Amino acid sequence: MTAPPQFPTPGPGNALIVLGCPEVPVQQALVLHISHQLRNHGFAVHATGNPAVLNLLKVSDPEKRYLPEMSILETCIGEIAEKRRDCGLCIVFAHSDAGISYAATMRHLLPASRLVLIIFGKDPETLAAAADFTCEKIVEKAVHNPMQLRKKINGVFGWVA
């Protein structure tokens, strides 16, 4: 008989990063930056997204120094819905309406968690207006250059760049 999979202990020290499609280049660099900072501040970090974005991250972090745990988004949502996964902090990247929908799903499934929605891309203000649920929003027009968005993220979390 196979032992059931082990999941991190629920609690405020667990962070979940929800990734969108890897179409916009800044996302990958910022995910690695955020994960690095969170791990330095004592968080266990889990990333979730579609296979394409996870494969890009696996290539970028082959030794799993920044992202030791990753899973397919639909699997992660199922684990959360079944109360097998929890987090105190959920960070969602959104550059399309699908990202906003995933953030709304996380808000519904994780009502007690801090939800930070990072909205970026070519037209982030329009997307930000569609996020009509409780969350902290970080909004920046960013496609290729992550520096301004990184500065805003660092400000929200109190990290020194």
Residue positions per predicted region:
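N-terminal beta-loop-helix "entrance" segment that forms/cooperates
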Residues: 51-72
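A short acidic, amphipathic alpha-helical/loop segment
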Residues: 30-33, 101-108
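Short acidic, S/G/P-rich loop/turn micro-motifs used as interaction or catalytic elements
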Residues: 22-26, 53, 95-101, 123
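Structural motif
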Residues: 14, 88-92
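Short internal beta-strands
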Residues: 44-50, 117-120
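Histidine-anchored nucleotide/phosphate-binding helix
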Residues: 28-40
